[in-house]
Every structure is written in structure tokens, then in C-alpha cells.
């Protein structure tokens, strides 16, 4: 990466927002390949070349972009040279992969300058999925209601381009993006399930979606922060998109041009917003009436300002004490922990009943068993079955695969309040492994276990990572060690969700 820093150091005064020339640089495509932005990109699948990165294709693409008008590649070009048997798809892949690197440069520079400040200490820990759960433990126990929001998708690709133009002020780059998006829409009808290559870079689509989501999030958060100035203000709407960021400090009244409904905003220091996987959570200590106002505010903001079709049914209001939130592989809810305190005053004694709210995080066992059933580890009732597709592998390979899945699930679900569901998942994987090995050796499970014993499955029962750490800190038999094993542990090294955990 250091050898490319010279190229990426753009002139802050004149060239910071002009990214189009970078599309003609070979090192951009090398970055897309080396950093694995899309592993199916820029790989040759033709005869004699194998799966190797080809700088020759990159050079020819750059020459064609220099010589041809607006990157127009005719459909007849694929018949001109057998070396480019699917060059239309390959060119689209390469352009989208390179553009995915280029368009992130302004954001990367801002992130580097921001993370170097004192306010972001150990920013790498914030990348972990588990980092959000300690925050929920501290905040959700004091809140009453939660809005479960299903974020709508843009109905037109032009909306994605328009959202990006406030960050990338290079018209040529935006025209290239617009051209690539429309070419993708024209070519995707020719894609068949048998083709193993993807026309467009999913990382670029994810970047465009997040940029679009940041647009309405910035408006929502700004209105939230300015709500103290609007506590007694009833008004219509005013939001001019182009000059919005320049008018933030002057915005006192908020009104809509498209409809005449009044908007009431109230100061609420106990409101938290989280967006994840196309969904969002808005938790607050407000009453149900005020939460209902926030609900229709979201719907109106999407429909009348961002031109995204949305209905009130996509935003559900739930009470935290009566509702379990399906959030990142956990069922989270707020429950009461009753306790009794005996107090003695002189000759009189009395008992004080006290109840504390705590965040309860449980494993969605039904959904997780459904994922294991789809992966052919068990049936729909949760009874373990053999994995016939793995029966051709060696015994050690089969055991390693099952142990790896078991440890990954245990690692991710280490924050569960109840470990019994996790033990059931381990049981399913353990006996699925035994049945797979018995199927391979054409034996019954009973005879297989009797012949080899259970020593080969000891990896399922070896101490977990947290147990090993605690055993180094506390002596064996320490009275809190057993309690620590049962407690919740959140890891700051988990940056992706296991495929089985993501059961949606």
C-alpha cells in the first residue's frame, strides 16, 4: 500500500475532488485486485491462463477508454478476438472495481484525518459488530420504546448518483458512474445463473447505498440536535438540498413545501439511532404518541424528499419490555430482574422489593436451527443428520470443518444471556459430524463410536478462548471463574457475521 501512497496524495487545493483521471491509472486496478474488493474481478477464465490477474487486459481497457467515445463497447467486439471471449462483462467488471477504489479516496482521506484526532482512540475497535452491544447494555435499559424501521430502497439509479454528487464534485466521474449503472441495467438481463462472473462490483453498490443513507441520516440527526430550538415552533418545511450544509447554522424553522402538515419536534436526550443491514432502530424514552410522530416523520421524509416509496407499515413501534428485537443475530429485549433487600432499623426490620432493568440477549434458536437445516446439518425439527457432500473428504478434514463452524458460532454468540441454546447448537454439529463420518465408513453411529471412541471429538469440548484467558488470570477453582464462564463476553475482533448467523 505504501508504494501507491504517492499516487493517492492528491493536491488538496485543486485536484482533491477531481477523480476522473485516476480511472486511467493501472495501479488503481492493482489496488482493487490486491485488496480483494471483489475476488471475481479482473481474473482470466479463458483457456491457458488460469485464474491470474492480467495487467494486459487493464492496459487494453485503458487504451480503449482513451480512444473510444464515452466508453462505448460494441456488442460485436466479443467476436473479434477469442482472447476477449466475454470482454463486455470483463470491462464492466474492471471499470466498476476501479471506480469502487476511486470513489472511496475522498472518504478515506477524511477518515484518516479524523481518526488521527484525540477524540477517536482505538478506532479499530469500533469496527467490530460486538462493539454495539455494550452500548445497548448501557442505554437500552433506560428506554421505553423502539422503532423497528425497514429502510426502503431507491426506485431509480439516478438517485444514487445524485446523493454522491455532494461528496464527489467531479462531473466526469459522476457521468462515468451514471454510464456504468445504466450499462449494468442493460446487461443484467443477459446474465444467466450458469455464469460465474458478476457484472457489477457489489462493494460499489454498497458504497452508493451507504452514501444515500447518510443523506437522510444527516438531515434526521440535524433535526434531532436542533429540536431544542423547535420545542414550541409549529411550522411547514424548508430544506434546500444543494445548499443544505451551508445553511445548517441558520436553520431555525423547519417546514415542508410539498404539504402543509405541521411538524412538532421535542427535545429528547434519550434517543438513539442505529442502522444495520438495510434496517434501522430508533430507541427513545418518549411516549407512544411522540414515537408515532417520529414514525410518520420518517415516512414523509422518504416519500416527499427522497422520492422513495414507503408505507407506515415499514416502521413498527414496539415496547422494549414486551418485544424482542431481532438484531445482528441476537434477540434483544429489556427484562426486569427482581431482588429483595432486607433492612434492619433498631428493632424493626422490613424487606424492600427492587427491580432493575437489564438488556437480555438471547440466541434465536428457531431461526438458527432453520439455517442449520438449510445447510443440511439437521432436519427442520433440529435432529442431526449426516452431511453427504462432505463424505468424500478425509476424516481430519471433516472434523476440522465441523469444529471450525462450531467455534465460529460459539465465538459470535458468546454474548448470549442463556448458554443452553448454544449448547444445543453444539450438540447438533457434534452428532452431524459423527453421522457424516459413519456414513463415510458405511457404519452405524453406535458401532463407529464404539470402535473409535469419542477421543477424536475432543476438539468440540476443548476450552474456549475466553475460558483459556480466564484460566490464566484466575487460579483453578476460583469462586468467580464459574460465574465468568456463564457471563456475556463481547469480542472486538468480529467484523463480519457468520453465514449461519445471518439467517435472514
Swiss-Prot record:
GO cellular component: chloroplast
Keywords: Chloroplast, mRNA processing, Plastid, RNA-binding, tRNA processing
Subcellular locations according to the entry: Plastid, Chloroplast
GO molecular function terms listed in the Swiss-Prot or TrEMBL record: RNA binding
One GO-annotated biological process of the protein: RNA splicing
Key word Plastid present: yes
Record's keyword annotation contains Transmembrane: no
This protein's name: Maturase K
